[in-house]
A protein has these predicted regions:
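Cation-handling catalytic/transport regions enriched in His/Asp/Glu
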Residues: 1-96
């Protein structure tokens, strides 16, 4: 159940981000992936913090903290990998 709520929060973060940018000129509505993940990741963290706060047992808290840490590590590695890929891609493209 926690995964489903986290996924919903993530997607609502994307929806919020799109809503905020709706009235901007068309060329300003497009953004890089790392920016796109900002609001969605923030929404996930709100849910993770609330879930952790409501945990009843130490075992539940430890499991939730473990999931939170795994997600944070995956996100940081994902963002860094995308940055390296995009930097190399555009550098190679610029060279021809």
């Amino acid at each position: 159940m926690v995964n489903e709520v986290s996924t919903l929060a993530h997607e609502l973060g994307h929806a919020f981000h799109s809503h905020v940018m709706w009235d901007l000129p068309t060329l300003n509505q497009d953004y890089a992936m790392n920016v796109a993940e900002t609001a969605s990741t923030f929404a996930e963290l709100i849910v993770a913090d609330a879930t952790l706060k409501e945990a009843k047992t130490d075992e539940e808290k430890i499991n939730l903290l473990d999931v939170k840490l795994q997600n944070a590590i995956a996100m940081f590695m994902n963002i860094h990998a995308r940055f390296i890929f995009e930097s190399n891609f555009y550098a190679a493209r610029q060279k021809g």
